[in-house]
Amino acid sequence: WYTVDGIFTRKSSSSRPRHLTNDDLSNHYTRGVSYKEIFPNKELGTNDNTTLPVLNLAFYPNERGPYNLDAENVNSDGTLGNPEKRWGGVMRKIEPSDLESANYEYIEFWLLDPYLEDETAEGGDLYFNLGEISEDILKDERKFFENGMPVDGDMSKVDTTVWGKVPRTQSTGYAFDAQNRELQDVGLNGLSTEEEQIFPTYADYLNKLRAKLSGETISKMMDDPFSPFNDPAGDNYHYFRGDDYDAKELDILSRYKRYNGTEGNSQESDQRYATAGKSTPDVEDINGDNTLNETEKYFEYKISLRPKDLQVGVNNIVDERTPEVTLMNGDKEKVKWYLFKIPIKDYEKRVCLLYTSPSPRD
């Protein structure tokens, strides 16, 4: 989940990698989207940005995500088995928290046709959960916050869980030690990549994974800095720019695959530009109230993203637009946008779950 940076959407950008052509910049899922494309009657001032900040959600169901230690359902080439059973999700704080009192009535958004490049795709489902969602991302009933990791090497200040290390201290705020940021910016498991290599949970995962893979796959993975053998937890961060990315001539989508990593996402840069994804520690405290919420109590809304269900009048779709857009390569193409408007009162399911603490392989 990300917003594509302007260096990839502005035609005049001097920072764009040279190998990216105008054809690359014309991909509908990474190109810039103008206000007029969706809101043709919107009046813009002379100093207004004419490009919409689009939320991009990319899901690769046959590729491993952070802290996924499933070594059983893996193919010999390293891809995940049963991709149709995989899921991906994001969560964030919503303000105000009391939507009813604030008179919010709908979940409303425009969605670009997901099947512009593959009309034969079967599609899937998109869920929205509004309410209390557990902040315990790595299920251990302990709140992790990166700035709680000791910088003096005193391991009496941490406890060990099945996932890694967690601070024993209570959090009073979230800010890195100014002089030792690299010792704390280790991701939500409290372990650096080097520590993951020898930590029992990840070492066991790697042993089981190695037995499932072909020799050719293992050889390729050893050369991949983001493979499980070089990043056991799968939590390492990489900015969407980098000399290594340029050398590999990565496309725009591939450049954002590691952008949500939590280990190393606040480091100072040795590049000629800033590369940090954020300046604050990663924490299991989405709403910033200094507590760990473990409750699952929410309203669930479901929409189908199957091609046959993308039509006005059903599936909470209330409008559609088919503008003709001029792409960076000069081509003109028609694309379709769907307007979803989901009444908050019309939830599909009300969920209230008791907390359980599964193993990292569940």
List each language-model region with its residue ranges:
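Long, low-complexity, polar/charged, intrinsically disordered or flexibly structured peripheral segments
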Residues: 1-84, 175-339
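Extracellular/lumenal carbohydrate-interaction signature centered on repeated Trp-anchored short motifs
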Residues: 96-103, 331-334
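Extended extracellular/luminal ectodomain segments enriched in beta-structured repeat modules
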Residues: 101-106, 121-123
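Extended, low-complexity, turn-rich repeat/linker tracts enriched in Gly/Pro/Ser/Thr and Asp/Glu
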Residues: 114-120
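Short edge-strand/loop segments of extracellular domains
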Residues: 130-138
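Outer-membrane beta-barrel and related beta-rich outer-membrane complex signature
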Residues: 138-144
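Conserved small/polar residues in nucleotide/adenosyl-binding loops
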Residues: 355-362
